Amino acid sequence: GLFLPTAFTPNNDGKNDVWRVIGLEKYPNAIVSVFDRAGQLVFFSDQRSPRYWNGTYKGQLLPNGVYVYMIDLKDGSGQVPKGTVSIIY
């Protein structure tokens, strides 16, 4: 299964600086999307891009807050795990 951390702290202290879906390697075709409260896509990852999010959008750190993720596993199951992740400074 997947483990989806509920928060991370992208403050470059070497601890929890990125949000990474644990177990995603079992789903090589999965697509990960993260949206802000307004519904704007702020992170997208597929098999050709990094599989973790550092809390930035267009090179700028995003503010504290709750963001919504959606993971299309692309494994034929139709499962699309959804939830929230918080950025905390």
Where do the protein language model's features map onto the residues?
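Short loop/turn motifs at secondary-structure boundaries
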Residues: G1-Y89
